[in-house]
Amino acid sequence: MRKTAKEAVRQRKIYMVLIIILIIVLSALGGGYYLLSQKKANEQKNVEQNSSSQTQAGQEQSSDTVEYRGETYKYNDHLSNYLFMGIDTRNPIDTYQTQEDAGQADAIFLVSMDRSTEKMKVLFIPRDSMTKIEIFNPSGKSLGESTDHINIQYAFGDGKQKSCELMKTAVSNMLDGLPIQGYCSMNMDGIAVITDFVGGVQITIPDDSLADVNPEYKKGAVVNITGENAEQFVRYRDTGKTQSALVRQERQKTFLQALVQKAQEKAAKDAGFVTDLYDSVQSYTVTNMGNDIFAKLLAASQNGITDTETVPGEGTQGKNFDEYHVDEDALSDLIISMFYEKI
């Protein structure tokens, strides 16, 4: 019995670290990805606005069944939906004490796995999306709901399970009550830890987006990225420029490709590498997902991601911060196409 338990723990570590690598890739690319997709979404906006859509008004006898654009749809109950978040804090999770420690969700995406086909879809949620979130005072008392950036919902929790639960609720509400079965968050210190653990990565700089910050980072230069400079390389953007997350996308992509390749090489040579890597990052991770979930996600990830979408909308400059205003009509279309089946 003891042997079986130990094997289960070890197996979960293997599943966990592989999914974490996926999380890192998607989290860091998430901000840039939605901006690229934004242009396509805006081009479709006029077409979508020609049709009226009233998601809530279309509710029928069953909460799983809706009338939409003259057709009847049923929620695909073969789906399991999991929320993944990249958090902008830098310390181990167990050191968090108050809201001030929690941080914000720097990247947010939903992985939807179809259990019948063992395939996955990914829905990116722009961090600056304006939506209903629940506000709390510093002592943890709810002050009701307010429309604000979805990424700060995480900050009203404890940086642990409460923050994740709040984000889970906010995302579900944004997606018209979509069920979310689990969550996993990792703060940005995890990237530095993994970078050092694999021994750093060598990268050819893809553009000049960091040249003004560090003259060594000129386009075409070959540099070594370690835990010390990984955060700057991956996360830096000029916050004085609106929607500047797009600029850092190529850097992120180049870094993450090199990181995953290095991790794969290490794992192929060292049977204990995966377990040790998991041990190095678990202090920066919060999840309510068990061994069986990670096993299924791993299997599904090997079949590839069949679809990637972004919550449709438009990025604008708000009074103080960037804002992303969701196109509710287009989002209704997307929810139906991703999570429902026509009957």
Predicted regions and their residues:
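Non-catalytic, solvent-exposed segments at the cell envelope interface
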Residues: 2-7, 12, 18, 30-343
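Core hydrophobic alpha-helical transmembrane segments of single-pass membrane proteins
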Residues: 21-29
